[in-house]
Amino acid sequence: MDYDRYKLFVGGIAKETSEEALKQYFSRYGAVLEAVVAKEKVTGKPRGFGFVRFANDCDVVKALRDTHFILGKPVDVRKAIRKHELYQQPFSMQFLERKVQQMNGGLREMSSNGVTSRTKKIFVGGLSSNTTEEEFKSYFERFGRTTDVVVMHDGVTNRPRGFGFVTYDSEDSVEVVMQSNFHELSDKRVEVKRAIPKEGIQSNNGNAVNIPPSYSSFQATPYVPEQNGYGMVLQFPPPVFGYHHNVQAVQYPYGYQFTAQVANVSWNNPIMQPTGFYCAPPHPTPPPTNNLGYIQYMNGFDLSGTNISGYNPLAWPVTGDAAGALIHQFVDLKLDVHSQAHQRMNGGNMGIPLQNGTYI
């Protein structure tokens, strides 16, 4: 419907942001027909995101091109996709091609910078302590044939560490899993990231970057080409864990994070064995507010105070051939992630944030 084509998801907004403020801000791009701030059904508290609807495509395109700050706070603006469209069965080729192209301007545009993050391995964080390896394997096998599945445990106490890894026999299976970076497993919402081999992370231009002396234990790596407007990420050196944790994060409402300048070890694991992989989110991070910080990713885990760190971002782009393979995978796959947890998270009908910031 045209109604949905002109609708944008706005994430990470301040709790003081009113619908009128949201409408007034986006009116600079054209006529705003509707502005909604999502709120909890019971408490009425803002959930940290909202929606705006324009009158035409031109206004939508103009809004998507810019970096946005509302009430002095950086926000994430993406295309909105309705929930019933994502879960409609069966998938048609036309539907999938249209949705793939809608993802933040389409895969062709996203892959134009030449950066890819194809991998056969995924990182799964936020696992319940009751999740068994068999349950873990059974869930992720629905997306493709697996060659290795492991739930990480502490080497001393044998207690679960709250994360694991899944390796598929095909990179295309990973692309199918990453169509949603939130899944429900053992009645708990978990987050999925691409696990990129260490040798797969390198500087785009090889240039050295100066960072303050206090960060001498970090390694600064350019993220994406300058035209995308993103900054750099700070990485722990490989000897620390074997994969990169980010710096301490301060949570925005509804799971947004902004990186602070303090080292952090999370997943409740003081000591972690090397895994040899980095964890990469499925889409570029929004623009930085200073040279060292940026809004990292939508972690979306429980906000009970448990430390949940981000990971060094790699761009999500998929090549044209991979996009075709992904579509064919989708035709045969019946996603089963439309769950009560999603409904609780989204007030019944608000939808869930997807990779690339799209919203369903």
Swiss-Prot record:
MF terms from GO for this chain are:
mRNA binding; single-stranded RNA binding
Matching entries from InterPro entries are given as: Nucleotide-bd_a/b_plait_sf, RBD_domain_sf, RRM_dom
Q: What does this protein do?
A: RNA binding protein. Can also bind in vitro to single-stranded DNA.
Give the tissue specificity: Highly expressed in inflorescences and roots. Detected in leaves and seedlings, but not in stems. Expressed in vegetative shoot apex and root meristem, but not in root cap. Detected in flower buds, junction of pedicels, joints of immature siliques and pistil.
Q: Does the keyword Plastid apply?
A: no
Q: PROSITE patterns this protein is in?
A: RRM
* UniProt entry tagged with the keyword Disulfide bond: no
Annotated protein name in UniProt: RNA-binding protein 1
Where are the membrane-spanning stretches?
none
Leader peptide range in chain numbering: none
Keywords, comma-separated and alphabetical: Coiled coil, Repeat, RNA-binding
Organism in which the protein naturally occurs: Arabidopsis thaliana (Mouse-ear cress)
User: RRM domain: which residues?
Assistant: 6-82, 120-197
Pfam families documented for this protein = RRM_1
Coiled-coil residue windows: 93-113
Disulfide links within the chain:
none
